[in-house]
Amino acid sequence: MAVQQNKKSPSKRGMHRAHDFLTAPATAVEATTGEAHLRHHISPNGYYRGRKVVKTKND
């Protein structure tokens, strides 16, 4: 089992963890319906880039 040679200081520990945070997913707003959706995904109404691409129950 690996054991550290020297104790890591709080500063170095913080520097090591500096990039461990989560980023919020990028969302886009559909031009026709105004709904927010993940980029490069269709909106809940079945629209992608202003065009209807999937049939939904309401159609």
Swiss-Prot record:
UniProt GO molecular function: structural constituent of ribosome
Pfam families listed in its UniProt record: Ribosomal_L32p
SUPFAM superfamilies: Zn-binding ribosomal proteins
Keyword DNA-binding (UniProt): no
GO cellular component: large ribosomal subunit
Basic residues composition-biased segments: 49-59
Region (Disordered): 35-59
Listed name of the protein: Large ribosomal subunit protein bL32
Gene that specifies this protein: rpmF
